[in-house]
């Protein structure tokens, strides 16, 4: 892989991991169009590792929030009052919201790996329509401070849906938050905080299992480093941009993006450019891997 291609993949990962449009769908299709198949262990390792860059972007961007939540949760637990402060409660609610995706990933991973490009196209369109409904019907009034245990669990279930390729981790969780009445920015902020435990755990596992595939592959190793750095830096900027966008604007642009991407993938399948089935296991969706 050339360094230019690696940088483009890193940029694509950053954009589609945090925007509610599905990083899995875009990376797989972009890879197919450039002649990179997940049958190639080196490309699979590359795709997995560059996603660590966007995880790093979340950790750096929300470092103050994460430190405050962890400290408050630990302090409350030590004092025998684990839910004694708003920060402590939010910290434990994030843990609660992580459980559905962790359980679903453990039980369904191998079945989901068998899903093909038609599922990606369908998920892009279906979840785009749900996002449209959330945008039009939700009240958009609640803040992150208003998250309760029920909210965290329901948004956690939405995060588990991101196991389906094309759904987008950020897409399902932001949509879920909006349907529960949260503002667009609050839904996105909680979505990003909720992603931390599952992406750290699953990312560490995937890194451990895929890094050996790059041994002795100097060119691929350099390309992977470039892609990871680009995804981290660009990911930080995308988070900042998205939160600012959602503060004053709607998600309609992402609805259009999803519908157009789903239609484009369907057209590519029908024309024979993309295979209909999954020729190799896709990388886990953003929440579990390796989004959106």
From Swiss-Prot:
Its EC number is 3.6.1.27. It catalyses: di-trans,octa-cis-undecaprenyl diphosphate + H2O = di-trans,octa-cis-undecaprenyl phosphate + phosphate + H(+). GO terms for molecular function: undecaprenyl-diphosphatase activity. One of its GO terms (cellular component) is plasma membrane. One of its GO terms (biological process) is regulation of cell shape. It is a multi-pass membrane protein. It comes from the Bacteria. InterPro entries: UppP. It holds the Pfam family BacA. It is found in: Cell inner membrane. Bacitracin is thought to be involved in the inhibition of peptidoglycan synthesis by sequestering undecaprenyl diphosphate, thereby reducing the pool of lipid carrier available. HAMAP family: Undec_diphosphatase. Catalyzes the dephosphorylation of undecaprenyl diphosphate (UPP). Confers resistance to bacitracin. PANTHER family: UNDECAPRENYL-DIPHOSPHATASE (PTHR30622:SF4). Belongs to the UppP family. This is Undecaprenyl-diphosphatase. It comes from Anaeromyxobacter sp. (strain K). The lineage of its organism: Bacteria, Pseudomonadati, Myxococcota, Myxococcia, Myxococcales.
